[in-house]
């Protein structure tokens, strides 16, 4: 099925028996509806006037139209006299960025309308959705509520792709932490955590939508089609559990990272302490030797113990310095050994 205009609008009439037929405009769609079947209307980035033009023939409520124009709405389902309004989210993950786009659906007795804005990074969304509907031809011909299931199932499949991409990133981060913590960036964990929180929030509300559908809150969804929606609910429940698991994994990775960094800092601190201890030992050993050499270098001392007065004065002085240095070394080593025993 091909869109009737360049990826902004596509109108189809689904006859009671036959393939969906593209129609050029709204007037032609309403004319075709007189022959039975139902209409499938897609609008990407519509203006307010485009939505208000649908208000009269399909009974779109003004509040629902406002929701379509507001990008900050949460997923929900609301029943109006002429239709059921469903707000679902579409996920798209690319270049480590999570895009969440709002998809609004109006389901009536003989029509289904899809409205969406800001198809971030996914301009072919509508074309692929129409291709999917072509593959699900038998379900599409069964009624507008079955087409609603096809659309929602497609949106849930895209959630699976997004969660799969996040899972691959989490696995890569785990390998980085274990193999080479130096190349690991903790901000990657924070980014993934934010993405998972957004996904979890969206899925929480979307599960509530499926709960209301499955308990027959909408009169425009037949009892026979409810079994199809239960399958979507099962998938969302699975994704919800996976997001919780991945959040726990990220928390564990952060604890692991902090623990490894603490160990690394401890090792560096111990290394610094060893260096300082060695320098201190060298300084302590040479302090008395420096004192003796200072005394020995005095002119008065040299006059009293010079070679002409005492031939062995200088050799004896050197031996005394060596004895003092060796004695200082062994005393320091003994004290260090005693400190280690006390610690143990």
Task: Annotate each PLM feature.
Residues 1-224, 228-231, 235-245, 304, ...:
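Peripheral, non-transmembrane regulatory/ligand-interaction domains of membrane transport proteins
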């Amino acid at each position: 099925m091909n869109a009737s205009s360049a990826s902004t609008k596509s109108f189809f009439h689904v006859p009671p028996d036959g393939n969906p037929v593209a129609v050029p405009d709204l007037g032609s769609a309403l004319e075709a509806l007189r022959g039975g079947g139902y209409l499938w209307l897609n609008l990407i980035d519509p203006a307010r006037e485009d939505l208000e033009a649908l208000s009269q023939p399909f009974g779109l409520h003004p509040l629902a139209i406002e929701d379509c124009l507001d990008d900050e709405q949460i997923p929900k389902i609301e029943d109006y006299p002429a239709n059921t309004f469903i707000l679902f989210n579409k996920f798209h993950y690319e270049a480590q960025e999570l895009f969440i786009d709002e998809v609004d659906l109006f389901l009536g007795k003989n029509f289904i309308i899809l409205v969406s804005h800001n198809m971030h990074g996914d301009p072919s969304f509508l074309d692929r959705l129409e291709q999917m509907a072509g593959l699900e031809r038998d379900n599409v011909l069964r009624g507008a509520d079955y087409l609603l299931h096809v659309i929602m199932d497609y949106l849930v499949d895209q959630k699976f792709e997004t969660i799969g991409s996040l899972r691959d990133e989490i696995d890569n981060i785990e390998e980085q932490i274990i193999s080479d913590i130096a190349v690991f960036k903790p901000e990657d964990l924070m980014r993934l955590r934010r993405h998972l929180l957004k996904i979890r929030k969206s899925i929480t509300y979307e599960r509530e939508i499926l709960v209301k559908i499955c308990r027959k809150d909408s009169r425009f969804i037949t009892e026979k089609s409810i079994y199809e929606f239960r399958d979507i609910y099962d998938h969302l429940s699975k994704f919800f559990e996976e997001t919780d698991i991945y959040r726990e994994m990220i928390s564990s990775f952060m604890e692991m990272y902090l623990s490894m960094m603490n160990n690394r800092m401890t090792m560096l601190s111990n290394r610094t302490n060893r260096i300082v201890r060695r320098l201190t030992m060298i300084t302590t050993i040479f302090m008395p030797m420096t004192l003796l050499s200072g005394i020995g270098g005095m002119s008065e001392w040299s006059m009293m113990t010079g070679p002409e007065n005492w031939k062995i004065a200088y050799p004896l002085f050197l031996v005394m310095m060596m004895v003092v240095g060796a004695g200082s070394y062994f005393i320091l080593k003994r004290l260090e050994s005693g400190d280690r025993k006390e610690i143990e």
